Every structure is written in structure tokens, then in C-alpha cells.
């Protein structure tokens, strides 16, 4: 990779600005000042900007994050803080959420820069299951599990939801597993049966379960097994 392209990615600036920074003696490679923007960067090179090391990325990245309330899963939002705030990674802005959560929903978010991998999670063709812990305003009705297993009619939609599995934990707390990703689906499913979601927490995507050791706002890389499970 050209040095100016790497610096542009790392700093989130244009190639022209990156070239100006390089010519301004602010970039070193293996301790030597490099002023040639076209310098060919090799994987083993150690790059620094103003003395601060810049890590090269080799291959796609995959993380799980325990999302707290109050953050959006988009990478750029003028009105709300985004989940990128928690990711202390080089060029974190290149990461995206493979399946977003609403601002008030907590739990498992998968972050990656591998578009094909995330597509296998979000594409309706792949029927990737997601499990949610749901707290309800009113006690769950006895027939809700059966209704969800058959599919329910969401407001302003023609097709029934695909069969979903409901596990009752307490009268007002349930675990719901769905294989679709319609807009606000869990909240709308309970609205369709006359109830209301007051708290929503995602526990699982496919075979990947939220690490119980992650506090809200913490994240970790996915294991090779977790990465390979999507597909």
C-alpha cells in the first residue's frame, strides 16, 4: 500500500492532506522520516505519525460489543453518540454493525469491516436467528407463544412474521428467538398481541452468544470459531 493512502485511512483525511503531512516531516517508517507519498509500505514496516505508532491492518476484523442504552449503531450520527465510541481500534470508522440495535436496546452487536460476512447475518435469505431477552409492560398472555409460533400480523404489513420461539421466564420477562430482521420487529410483534416492550436486550446472533464477562460498553475480538460459525 502507498504511504499516503495508509496515512489517509489512519487519520480519516484525504490523500492530498496525507501527502502534505508526509512532506511536512511528520511521518516515520522504521524510525526514518519519509517524505515520499508514494513510498511502498510493507506489512513489516513500523509507521508513526508525530511519534505516535500507527498499526497496519491485515485482513478483516470482527468484534462483539455489549451495547448500552443511549448509543446508535450507525457509524456517523449528528444527534446521538455511536457505538464506535467504545471501539479503541485503528480506523474504527471502517467498522460497521452486522445487524443494528435501536438506541434504547442493549446487548450483542457484532462489528466488522467484512461486508460479505455481515451480509450473511443481515440478508433475509440466510434466516440468521437472533435471541432477545424481553421485559414486558403486562404479563404475557397464555396464547402468545402459540401465536408467535404460527406468525402474527404486524401493523401495515401484509405477510405474517416467520415462526418464532417464545420462552416464558417470568410473567413479564420472556426470551424470544426470531429469524427475520424487520423494522422494530420484536416491539411490533408484542404490540400485535396487545402488549408493550419496556426493555429489550439481544443475547445471541446465530451461534454467537454475548460474552457474559463483557460489561456494558466493553468489547472483544471474536474467536475463530465464532467467525466461522457465520456462513
Swiss-Prot record:
Keyword terms, alphabetized: Isomerase, RNA-binding, rRNA processing
Transmembrane segments: none
EC number: 5.4.99.19
Signal peptide: none
GO cellular component: cytosol
GO MF, one annotated term: pseudouridine synthase activity
Reactions this protein catalyses: uridine(516) in 16S rRNA = pseudouridine(516) in 16S rRNA
Listed InterPro entries: PsdUridine_s_RsuA/RluB/E/F_cat (IPR042092), PsdUridine_synth_cat_dom_sf (IPR020103), PsdUridine_synth_RsuA/RluA (IPR006145), PsdUridine_synth_RsuA/RluB/E/F (IPR000748), PsdUridine_synth_RsuA/RluB_CS (IPR018496), RsuA_PseudoU_synthase (IPR050343), S4_RNA-bd (IPR002942), S4_RNA-bd_sf (IPR036986)
The family this protein is said to belong to: Belongs to the pseudouridine synthase RsuA family.
Subunit structure: Monomer.
Record's protein name: Ribosomal small subunit pseudouridine synthase A
Species: Salmonella typhimurium (strain LT2 / SGSC1412 / ATCC 700720)
Lineage, broadest ranks: Bacteria, Pseudomonadati, Pseudomonadota, Gammaproteobacteria, Enterobacterales
